[in-house]
Amino acid sequence: MSSDSMRNIRNFSIIAHVDHGKSTLADRIIQLCGGLQAREMEAQVLDSNPIERERGITIKAQSVSLPYTAKDGQTYHLNFIDTPGHVDFSYEVSRSLAACEGALLVVDAAQGVEAQSVANCYTAVEQGLEVVPVLNKIDLPTADVDRAKAEIEAVIGIDAEDAVAVSAKTGLNIDLVLEAIVHRIPPPKPRDTDKLQALIIDSWFDNYLGVVSLVRVMQGEIKPGSKILVMSTGRTHLVDKVGVFTPKRKELPALGAGEVGWINASIKDVHGAPVGDTLTLAGDPAPHALPGFQEMQPRVFAGLFPVDAEDYPDLREALDKLRLNDAALRFEPESSEAMGFGFRCGFLGMLHMEIVQERLEREYNLDLISTAPTVVYEVLKTDGTVINMDNPAKLPQLNLVQEIREPIIRANVLTPEEYIGNIIKLCEEKRGTQIGINYLGSQVQISYELPMAEVVLDFFDKLKSVSRGYASLDYHFVRFDAGPFVRVDVLINGDKVDALSLIVHRGHADRRGRELCEKMKDLIPRQMFDVAIQAAIGSQIISRSTVKAMRKNVLAKCYGGDVSRKKKLLEKQKEGKKRMKQVGRVEIPQEAFLAVLQMDK
């Protein structure tokens, strides 16, 4: 495609923290360009998944192509690619940004800049995008435009003098945003090769069409009937249909360079079209793939088990279907003595895990029990081999282990000054190492290296509570570090419950074991016999608590009388309880498994 025909194309994305009004701004832009009639408009048009709407977050990338007649009389093609805002989905954000030449940085004028926007904005600047700041929610009485501009300049370091102040809710100044997109964001540049290169921004599964991929054509063109090659897998597919979203799906005869649209090539699962991969023509391939592709690595693992064992095949089918849509989800069958058959699943983070579990329960009507989430540890065995271990129950015997290494992340926290003390205290409690503190205007950026295991459980919630909701967090994986780690097992009446095992730092093991036993004592219902709950490291018991038996008062019918008669009755009761204990099994309620999660609370 010539540079002339690309001159009026603008590809842009919106960067914003959760709740800063990104989806509402997108709705207004679609409405103003006539993508949907007023009666077809509904709030958050692009958040198509019901969970996205309820939680007010965007999970998957979506796109929309709109014609816009600018004030200079020319018609421009705006391709808007929606991005997720949560830290768990940062790889999807980087792919969406790679498909654009510019980005709108949306900042809530009342709240100021948050860490997630900073991280995504840095990604955009690194990829050479033109960033246009937009201050949203100026209709709020607490909005402070000048302060927000100063924060953008101090924290992110881009010029905010020409920032557009808008209210997406009322539609104020949305036309100025469109003019800024047209005049400040550059058109796509022609590449040095004329062979087809298309970046896969996202893929999802459609029951009728198979996999539909959202692509940005960098060079060349795709049309129905072309034979395309997926560069990382080496597979070839025949293109059935191509088109754009307006937001409705609209078929086109071809997609040319600079354009963003969807293609359907009868691929059967999402793994056949991985996010971030490059498509090219099988007969005339491009010399190299587009940069930046990486396999998505799950960071958090948990066991998912059906409450009713008969639901196991349904759970397998549901996970298979979800995986069609979610390339980051990994799972493999797992059996546990305490919980029966289920799956060990890998997720990007805690939010991802919650969303997957919620979708399984809601869309497939399954009742599930999830075990405590764990991170992946590297275990160096005495024979020199290194294994990745995502399940504490699978830790080899201690005499075979030379060292255990845990994943370390670099966390950047942005907070108002008055909460610095609380946040540093929290990070120190979580075994953090301080890297630095930067004062940026009225905000402070605190950098820490923290063990991922400490962050995964409840760090985010605690961070919000010690800073009254003002601090925001962004993190990325750095390396594995060795440390003195042990596995704490939970025994109930002498039987090990594998689903409750956890790997902890040696220094915290006694406290965690004690807390766990106390918590379990409150949650396991009383039986007809004593239930002993013990925490152990190997064969050493570090803590114990007992759930006392329910017992009938067998002496009630003895009014006075001989003491030996009473003793006989009590001994008889004791014998009965002993027999009961040998045959009795303790049912462990779901809350007990969740107790492991909420230990520090």
From Swiss-Prot:
The keyword Cytoplasm does not apply. Keywords: Cell inner membrane, Cell membrane, GTP-binding, Hydrolase, Membrane, Nucleotide-binding, Protein biosynthesis. Its EC number is 3.6.5.n1. It catalyses: GTP + H2O = GDP + phosphate + H(+). It is a peripheral membrane protein. The lineage of its organism: Bacteria, Pseudomonadati, Pseudomonadota, Gammaproteobacteria, Lysobacterales. Belongs to the TRAFAC class translation factor GTPase superfamily. Classic translation factor GTPase family. LepA subfamily. GTP binds at D19, H20, G21, K22, S23, T24, N136, K137, I138, D139. Required for accurate and efficient protein synthesis under certain stress conditions. May act as a fidelity factor of the translation reaction, by catalyzing a one-codon backward translocation of tRNAs on improperly translocated ribosomes. Back-translocation proceeds from a post-translocation (POST) complex to a pre-translocation (PRE) complex, thus giving elongation factor G a second chance to translocate the tRNAs correctly. Binds to ribosomes in a GTP-dependent manner. PROSITE patterns: G_TR_1, G_TR_2. Residues 7-189 form the tr-type G domain. The keyword Hydrolase applies. It is found in: Cell inner membrane. GO terms for biological process: positive regulation of translation. It is an enzyme of class 3 (hydrolase). NCBIfam families: lepA, small_GTP. This is Elongation factor 4. HAMAP family: LepA (MF_00071). InterPro entries: EF-4 (IPR006297), EFG_III/V (IPR035647), EFG_V-like (IPR000640), EFTu-like_2 (IPR004161), G_TR_CS (IPR031157), LepA_C_sf (IPR038363), LepA_CTD (IPR013842), LepA_IV (IPR035654). GO terms for molecular function: GTP binding; GTPase activity; guanosine tetraphosphate binding; ribosome binding; translation elongation factor activity. Its main location: membrane. Transmembrane segments: none annotated. It comes from Xanthomonas axonopodis pv. citri (strain 306). GO terms for cellular component: plasma membrane.
